[in-house]
């Protein structure tokens, strides 16, 4: 197993359909501009309430990716 060094970014994804989709939205967006994504950690979950019901989910994730070179 080789040694790795990871860079971590923190992102917040959102979705009206649930937590899992909010996470997937954050990871998909990160994948558009970052390479070598390796893992994520959910660090916060929030929701927006409207009319007494959950209207929207927000999930903050830390995303780790390996650095190129070296």
From Swiss-Prot:
List of residues binding riboflavin: 39, 46, 58
Key word Flavoprotein present: yes
Protein keywords: Flavoprotein, Nucleotide-binding
Pfam families, per the entry: Dodecin (PF07311)
Keyword Flavoprotein appears in the UniProt entry: yes
Gene3D superfamilies: Flavin-binding protein dodecin
InterPro entries reported for this sequence: Dodecin, Dodecin-like, Dodecin-like_sf, Dodecin_bact
Gene Ontology molecular function terms on file: nucleotide binding
Source taxon at top rank: Bacteria
Subunit composition and interactions: Homododecamer; 12 subunits assemble to form a hollow sphere.
Family statement drawn from the similarity comment of this UniProt entry: Belongs to the dodecin family.
Main function: May function as a riboflavin storage protein that binds and sequesters riboflavin, thereby protecting cells against undesirable reactions mediated by free riboflavin. Protects bound flavin against light damage; flavin fluorescence is rapidly quenched by interaction with Trp-39.
Name of this protein: Dodecin
């Amino acid at each position: 197993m080789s040694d790795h060094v990871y860079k971590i970014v923190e992102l917040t994804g959102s979705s009206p359909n649930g937590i899992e989709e909010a996470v997937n939205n954050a990871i998909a967006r990160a994948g558009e501009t970052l390479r070598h994504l390796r893992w994520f950690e959910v660090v916060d979950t929030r929701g927006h309430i409207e009319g007494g019901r959950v209207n929207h989910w927000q999930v903050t994730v830390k995303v780790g990716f390996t650095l190129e070179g070296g």
